[in-house]
């Protein structure tokens, strides 16, 4: 882990308008950033939009890292915002399985053969509009 200041470009996001309490930060280093971002926008964003609120989710997004660059560091950050720790745990435990329509189309296994580099849970203490 490298300490310091990180700069990201927000590529896309969803916001339900409801304040979340916890956010899952997914750090990724896909084999192709452009394809990863495009799949998130065209496949995953509609899925999250359709299901927003059903599982306690209040937000979703994706960003690409601008700087700093380290050879083994993540280059993409995605986030999922939830209303409670209970709903975070249910989500991470796979209690809301993916529909086959998504599972059959995703290329995540090819774009990230080793999965996410890190998955972190952060508590939201405050925010501004």
Identify the meaning behind each predicted range.
Residues 1-129:
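Short S/T/G/P-rich N-terminal loop/turn motif that feeds into the first structured element of a domain
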